[in-house]
């Protein structure tokens, strides 16, 4: 997070609208004032250099007021789902060593304090040499989300990098308008608006993603670009014919999508609906970002996720660390010119295990063709990507197995037209009487909603290999 880009734009274009949220329009001058005041309040709350602010708010401007205020103090932002359960919040706050949690309950008092302070008191930048800007969480293979620490690159280097990306995307005007309906706690949700604010664009924040509302706001605000997961594209294309017929999307220059595989048939439908050349795809993860492919390129290389984005490098390695030639499948490694862009908190061994030099792997298998285009042939072995959000089965299994009527459980992802994959629990019951609805309700008491199973199947035993490991591939084939 960068709390000072807003200040620069407030000086250069004070009356430029920074954030639109419903009927609210906040200029850069107003946003800078709010962020400065928030920094004063947060400092009084004990937030300072190298400390951490947890943000568990719904989509609203105050999300950025708090996060950017913390950044001005040299503190890290810890995004937390606003719908997280008590158990999940406790984990995020304890593991993240959160000094103050800005959630919906704390927001009214916080904003009253912000309104009452003198922004002149706002502290200057106090950042440790190893300042960590963001402590985001990615689902962990051991059953608990893992903290990913993103250091703040020098401001000039950070902005130069963003400019390179956005020039490559064809979004090089200061008058660009971003629209987002993704949850701001998710990296894919806040990175678009945050980048927009760094570059002096306007960002339009929706409470949540609703296709009818999205079309209406795009037309009303003349939005020029959006970041979407395939589930959003599906919902847009599933809107009523009358809604789509009346939709004015002529202002859209780029529909950028990523975070999960997109069915070729859906992508072609989206490409036909939006202005020519508007649909571009990116590939990366919470940890890093690596490729981009234009609409024209994708038509020539269907199925590819693109070539290395400006400032990025892609290589394919075998299990022994040897670099593979074009056409050979291996582990995909990506990285940026800035060096290592992240590390796992408190786990140097895990961090080192995914790096080769400054390149990191997301655990995906793929190959480069002779022209340098990346094709991902398989994703992380067990991870479920549902609606663009990553869910690791181990975390869900750890909750479900605590139900007294569950003897064994395996969680897998099954194909779904809307969500991409459905979180599905394959259960060996401990007795009689357990129902799917009961188990789903139990899961939602302990997990944020998108992690809970949407489908439950009952079996008498789970298929296992000679070492006792569950054969999830067999289950996926059986229930798909």
Which sequence ranges carry the predicted segments?
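Conserved AMP-binding/adenylate-forming core of the ANL superfamily
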Residues: 15-60, 85-90
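Structural core segment of the AMP-binding/adenylate-forming
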Residues: 40, 44-45, 49-52, 65-68, ...
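Conserved adenylate-forming
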Residues: 42-47, 122-130, 135-179, 199
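ATP-dependent adenylate-forming carboxylate-activation enzymes
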Residues: 57-58, 78-91, 105-110, 201-221, ...
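AMP-binding/adenylate-forming catalytic core of the ANL superfamily
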Residues: 84, 226, 343, 353, ...
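Conserved AMP-binding/adenylation subdomain of ANL enzymes
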Residues: 156-177, 185-224, 239
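Gly/Ser/Thr-rich phosphate-binding loop
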Residues: 198, 224-228, 239-301, 313
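Conserved ATP/PPi-binding loop(s) of AMP-dependent carboxylate-activating enzymes
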Residues: 311, 322-354, 389-391
């Amino acid at each position: 997070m960068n709390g000072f880009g807003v200040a620069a734009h407030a000086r250069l274009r004070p009356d430029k609208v920074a954030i639109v949220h419903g009927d609210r329009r906040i200029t850069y001058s107003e946003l800078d004032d709010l962020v400065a005041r928030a920094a004063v309040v947060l400092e009084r709350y004990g937030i300072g250099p190298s400390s951490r602010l947890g943000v568990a708010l719904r989509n609203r401007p105050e999300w950025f007021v708090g996060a950017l205020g913390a950044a001005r103090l040299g503190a890290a932002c810890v995004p937390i789902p606003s719908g997280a359960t008590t158990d999940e919040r406790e984990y995020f706050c304890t593991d993240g060593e959160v000094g103050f949690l800005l959630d919906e309950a704390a927001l009214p008092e916080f904003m009253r304090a912000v309104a009452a302070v003198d922004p002149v008191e706002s502290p200057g930048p106090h950042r440790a040499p190893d300042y960590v800007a963001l402590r985001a969480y990615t689902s962990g293979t051991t059953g608990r989300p893992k903290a990913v620490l993103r250091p703040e690159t020098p401001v000039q280097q950070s902005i130069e990098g963003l400019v390179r990306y956005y020039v490559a995307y064809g979004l090089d005007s200061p008058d660009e308008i971003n629209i987002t309906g993704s949850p701001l706690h998710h990296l894919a949700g806040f990175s678009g608006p945050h980048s927009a604010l760094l570059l002096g664009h306007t960002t339009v924040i929706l409470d949540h993603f609703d296709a009818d509302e999205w079309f209406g706001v795009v037309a009303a605000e003349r939005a020029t670009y959006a970041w979407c997961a395939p589930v959003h594209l599906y919902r847009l294309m599933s809107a009523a014919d009358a809604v789509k017929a009346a939709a004015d999307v002529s202002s859209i220059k780029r529909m950028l999508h990523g975070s999960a595989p997109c069915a070729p048939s859906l992508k072609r439908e989206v490409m036909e609906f939006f202005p020519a050349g508007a649909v571009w795809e990116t590939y990366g993860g919470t940890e890093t970002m690596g490729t981009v492919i234009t609409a024209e390129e994708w038509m020539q290389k269907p199925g590819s996720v693109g070539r290395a984005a400006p400032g990025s490098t892609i290589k394919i390695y075998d299990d022994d660390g040897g670099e593979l030639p074009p056409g050979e499948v291996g582990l995909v490694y990506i990285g940026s010119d800035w060096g290592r862009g992240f590390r796992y908190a408190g786990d140097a061994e895990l961090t080192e295990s995914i790096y080769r030099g400054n390149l990191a792997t997301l655990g995906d298998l793929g190959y480069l063709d002779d022209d340098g285009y990346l094709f991902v042939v398989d994703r992380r072995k067990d991870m479920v990507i549902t609606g663009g959000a990553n869910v690791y089965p181990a975390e869900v299994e750890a909750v479900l197995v605590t139900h007294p009527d569950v003897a064994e459980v395996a969680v897998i992802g099954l194909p779904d037209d809307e969500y991409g994959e459905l979180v599905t629990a394959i259960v060996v019951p401990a007795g009689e009487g357990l129902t799917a609805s009961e188990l789903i309700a139990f899961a939602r008491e302990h997990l944020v909603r998108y992690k809970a199973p949407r489908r439950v199947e009952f079996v008498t035993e789970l298929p296992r290999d000679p070492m006792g490991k569950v054969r999830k591939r067999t289950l996926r084939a059986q229930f798909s």
